[in-house]
Structures are given as C-alpha cells and as structure tokens.
From Swiss-Prot:
SUPFAM superfamilies: Isocitrate/Isopropylmalate dehydrogenase-like
Cofactor requirement: Mg(2+); Mn(2+)
Record-linked PROSITE patterns: IDH_IMDH (PS00470)
Note describing how the cofactor binds: Binds 1 Mg(2+) or Mn(2+) ion per subunit.
Upper lineage: Bacteria, Pseudomonadati, Pseudomonadota, Acidithiobacillia, Acidithiobacillales
InterPro entries registered for this protein in UniProt: IsoCit/isopropylmalate_DH_CS, IsoPropMal-DH-like_dom, Isopropylmalate_DH
GO terms (BP aspect): L-leucine biosynthetic process
Coiled-coil ranges (or none): none
Subcellular location: Cytoplasm
Protein name as it appears in the record: 3-isopropylmalate dehydrogenase
NCBIfam families given in the database record: leuB (TIGR00169)
Length: 358
C-alpha cells in the first residue's frame, strides 16, 4: 500500500486538487495501485484552523507518506500575518521537513496551444524541456548572511556555497531523468567567474562517467538565459543550482504561454511532493474557473517518480492531450470568443479520456 498525503491549500487549491483526485482515484481503481489518500491542512487553511501554517499533524502526515500532492498556498487574506506565520512559510517548512532537494519542472509546448506562446510558433513548436534545480543549497541558504552597518554605511552579504555531495546527488537525478528522455543534459553554471560553480562543473563532469548514454554539455547561465529565448528547442534536460534554477525555470515556464498547464515535482530520498507551478489565484477561487490540468499532470509525475507506474503516467498525459485535441478549454487557455468549461468538467473530461473501459 502506498500512502499519499493531500494538501489542497488555499484559493483555487481545493478545486484543482479535487479534479486531480478524480483522475488519481480512477487510475488507482483501474491499475490496482492500492493507494491510501489522506488529506491535511497547510498554508492559510491551516492558519485559519490552528494559527500555524504547518501544524505538527500535517508535517507528520507528509513525512509518513510516500508522496505528497499540494494545490496552492497563500492569498491576501493572510497578508497581515507576520512573515514567520505567512501561509508560504508552511510550504517552505514542508519542503525542509521532507528534505526535498531536487525540483523538476517540465516546460512543454502543447501543439494545441502553440499560439499561446509569446514567441513565434517556429521557435517553440518542438520545445520539451525539463529543468532540474537543486533546492537546498547555494546562495539562498549559505552562511554567513546578513545586513550590517560599517562606518555608517549599510552593507548586505550572502554566501554562495555547495559541497560536492550536494552537487553529486542532484546530478544523478538529472542524468537519470535524461536517460528517460532524449539523453541530452546541459549543465548551467558560471564557472568562468564563480569558484562554487567551477566545482559544480567538475563534479557534474565526474558523474557523467556513470551515464555514457547521456550527452553532457555545459553552458554559462547568461548564455543559457539567452538561448532559452533564441532557440529553446535545443534543450532537453537543464541542470543547475538553486538561484540560477529559480530564474531559468520561471523563464522556461513562460515559453509555453500557459502557466496553468505546468506541473512540478520536488524529490528527496524516498519522499516527494507534486504541485502545479501556478499560485492560488484567489480572484477566481470558488468559481469553477481554475485550470486543473497542471495539477493533473503533477499526478502523472507522481505516478512516474514515486509510484513506479510509468505506463499510467503516460496514459494520464495522453488523456490531457486528447482533451485538448477535443477543443476543451478552461478560460485561461481559451482563445477569445471560444467556449470554455469549468474545473469540474475538465477533470471529468480527463477521466473520460483515460478510456478505462477499453
């Protein structure tokens, strides 16, 4: 039996998670996965119930699970809370508690939504990128850090640091991912300037010897940012550190022009969390307008990475493609003046497109 912890969160979170749960339940029943799903609170919903964005019971639930599904957290309702108690802190603490060190973000162009991209169709038509970002090190967590005043002048400082074990474990994740794709991996660094990323390049090159079937290349981060716009289809797997990955994964997500379609996975040793990359969209919460496809595709990633159910992951992804082929659209991905369907209807359409009666 596999245990799944489900945190719907805030805003549109409960709606999109409910739609994704429909798909997961249908797959579970058809594939006899034996899943046990348990719901918990995180973010603003947890604040409302317990005055804590991540109650101890929620963290325990997540740590006992084989995988976590998250909807979205945050919203203006909780803006007045002090920073340490904001809904987003619940998400950060959850990631830290689970020791999630690898973030996987696909950026795939759906041919049915080609016109949604801000770039010309010929540039993005074949884009299918996976950004693998290290989550626990780098300048975001390095010490020392702080603000100080010296001789009457304010000074801020941060420390960029990685050790070789941190680099090696994220590199293995990226190379394994590349083996299941087009077998190309581009490691992004700034090795011409930063000693930290010089070590990064050395260790990634060492790890590459374990994966002779994967073609490794290296690229400086400034060039990578340019190439993502100039010729994005050249990339398969992009591997990079925390700060560079933070920036490049957001850039890559915009290539698609449809943030409501993009899932993500955060992986640790034996634990993982799956969530859409979009926010809680409180302006449309409770109106059956949200696009659940990113969350449904996050379920597909969970089937692939945590449940050893690759054929079913592919089947969910194919069902999403089939729904788009049928012309079904939520408001965020619909062309002006075309019909739209709601969150519930889109979830039901994906379940139907699984063709489980075949």
């Amino acid at each position: 039996m596999k245990k799944i912890a489900i945190f719907a969160g805030d805003g549109i979170g409960p709606e999109i998670v409910a739609a994704a749960r429909q798909v997961l339940d249908a797959v579970d029943q058809a594939a006899h996965l034996g899943l046990r799903c348990t719901e918990g609170l995180v973010g603003g919903a947890a604040l409302d119930a317990s005055d804590d964005p991540l109650p101890a019971a929620s963290l325990q639930l997540a740590m006992a699970a084989d995988a976590v599904i998250l909807g979205a957290v945050g919203g203006p309702r909780w803006d007045a809370y002090p920073p340490a108690k904001r809904p987003e802190q619940g998400l950060l603490r959850l990631r830290k508690g689970l020791d999630l060190y690898a973030n996987l973000r696909p950026a795939q162009i759906f041919p049915q939504l080609l016109d949604a991209s801000p770039l010309r169709p010929e540039l993005v038509r074949d884009v299918d990128i996976l950004v693998v970002r290290e989550l626990t090190g780098d300048i975001y967590f390095g010490q020392p850090r702080g603000l100080e005043v010296i001789d009457g002048k304010r000074r801020g400082f941060n420390t960029m640091v990685y050790d070789e074990d941190e680099i090696r474990r994220i590199a293995h994740v990226a190379f394994r991912a590349a083996q299941g794709r087009r077998k190309q991996l581009c490691s992004v660094d700034k090795a011409n300037v930063l000693e930290t990323t010089r070590l990064w390049r050395e260790v990634v090159t060492e790890v590459a010897r374990d994966y002779p079937d994967v073609r490794l290349s290296h690229m400086y981060v400034d060039n990578a940012a340019m190439q993502l716009i100039r010729a994005p289809a050249q990339f398969d797997v992009l591997l990079t550190g925390n700060m560079f990955g933070d920036i490049l994964s957001d850039e890559a997500s915009q290539l698609t022009g449809s943030i409501g379609m993009l899932p993500s996975a955060s992986l640790g040793e034996g634990r993982a969390m799956y969530e859409p990359i979009h926010g809680s969209a409180p302006d449309i919460a409770g109106q059956d307008k949200a696009n659940p496809l990113a969350t449904i595709l996050s379920v597909a990633m969970m089937l692939r990475h945590s449940l050893n159910a690759e054929p079913w992951a592919q089947r969910v992804e194919a069902a999403v493609q089939r729904v788009l082929d049928q012309g079904l659209r939520t408001a965020d991905i619909a062309a002006p003046g075309t019909p739209v369907i709601g969150t519930k209807a889109m979830g039901a359409a994906v379940v139907n497109a699984l063709n489980l009666k075949d």
